[in-house]
Amino acid sequence: MSLQAIIEAAFERRAEITPKTVDAETRAAIEEVIEGLDSGKYRVAEKIDGEWVTHQWLKKAVLLSFRINDNQIIDGAETKYYDKVALKFADYTEERFAQEGFRVVPSATVRKGAYISKNCVLMPSYVNIGAYVGEGTMVDTWATVGSSRQIGKNVHLSGGVGIGGVLEPLQANPTIIGDNCFIGARSEVVEGVIVEDGCVISMGVFIGQSTRIYDRETGEIHYGRVPAGSVVVSGSLPSKCGKYSLYCAVIVKKVDAKTLGKVGINELLRTIEE
C-alpha cells in the first residue's frame, strides 16, 4: 500500500490503536509523515494551480501520532529564574506527570500553587499562582491565566487569550470562565468578569467590569457577566448625543448545550445575521 493508503486505513481503526497495539507498518508510516512534515517534504496545505489544497491524510497522520506515543519527559531550554515562587513542575518525575494526567508542551510555565486538572493541554502559555484550570481544558499558545483565576471544564483558551488576574485588593473577585466555553484568539476577560457556562467569545473581544455587554435580542445591557450560552462578538453602541460610538461586547445569539455540542464553533460565529 502507498503511504497515504496506510494512513487512511489506520485512521479508520484509530480507536483500536495504542502505543502497545500499533503494528510496525503503521508506526513507520506515521513516523515517516511526521519526519516529512518536519523537513518540509510534506505540507498539510499547499497552493496548487492558484488554489489552496488541504491534504487531509497528513492531518490524519498527525492525529494518529498522538495514539502511538506515550507521554514522556521533554527537557526544555536550560536557564535560570530569580523569584519568590517556585515553578509547579520543578520536582515532577515522569511518573508524577503520568499520574496527574495532563500534557505540558515545552515553554509552558505554571507557578507553584496553580492547579491543573486531568486531560488538560498546556501549549506554551502561562498559568499564575492560585489559578484553577478544569478538566479537559486547552490553554493555547501565549494564553495567560492570571493569579487566582478559575477556568472550568472543557474550555478552549485560544492563542494569546488573557484571563486577567491580580491578588490585590483582597475584595476583588476572580475572573471566572465557566464550563464548555470557547474564548477566541487575543480576547481579554479581566476584572472579575464571569463568563457563564457554554459561552462562545469571538476573537478580539475585550470584557472588563465597565464593558457594556449588549444583548441585541432583548436590548438588555449586562455588566460584569456574560449569560450562559451567549455567542459574543465585539461591537459598538452610540453615545447619548449620537456624535460618537463606544466599544461594547454584543451578544448576537444564544445556544443551548445540545446545539453547542453539535455545531462547530466557527459555524456559530459565521452564521450571525446582521
UniProtKB/Swiss-Prot annotation:
Pathway it works in: Amino-acid biosynthesis; L-lysine biosynthesis via DAP pathway; LL-2,6-diaminopimelate from (S)-tetrahydrodipicolinate (succinylase route): step 1/3
Query: Matching InterPro entries, A to Z?
Result: DapD_Trfase_Hexpep_rpt_fam, Hexapep, Hexapep_transf_CS, THP_succinylTrfase_dom1, THP_succinylTrfase_N_sf, Trimer_LpxA-like_sf
Q: Which GO terms describe its biological process?
A: diaminopimelate biosynthetic process; lysine biosynthetic process via diaminopimelate
Per UniProt, where does substrate bind?
A: 103, 140
Q: Which UniProt keywords apply?
A: Acyltransferase, Amino-acid biosynthesis, Cytoplasm, Diaminopimelate biosynthesis, Lysine biosynthesis, Repeat, Transferase
EC number(s) from the headed UniProt entry = 2.3.1.117
Query: Its principal location?
Result: cytoplasm
The enzyme's first-digit EC class, named in words, is transferase
PROSITE patterns per record: HEXAPEP_TRANSFERASES
Where is this gene product found? Cytoplasm
* Self-association state and partner proteins as the record states: Homotrimer.
Similarity-based family? Belongs to the transferase hexapeptide repeat family.
Q: Which PANTHER family match?
A: 2,3,4,5-TETRAHYDROPYRIDINE-2,6-DICARBOXYLATE N-SUCCINYLTRANSFERASE, MOLYBDENUM COFACTOR GUANYLYLTRANSFERASE
Name the record gives this protein: 2,3,4,5-tetrahydropyridine-2,6-dicarboxylate N-succinyltransferase
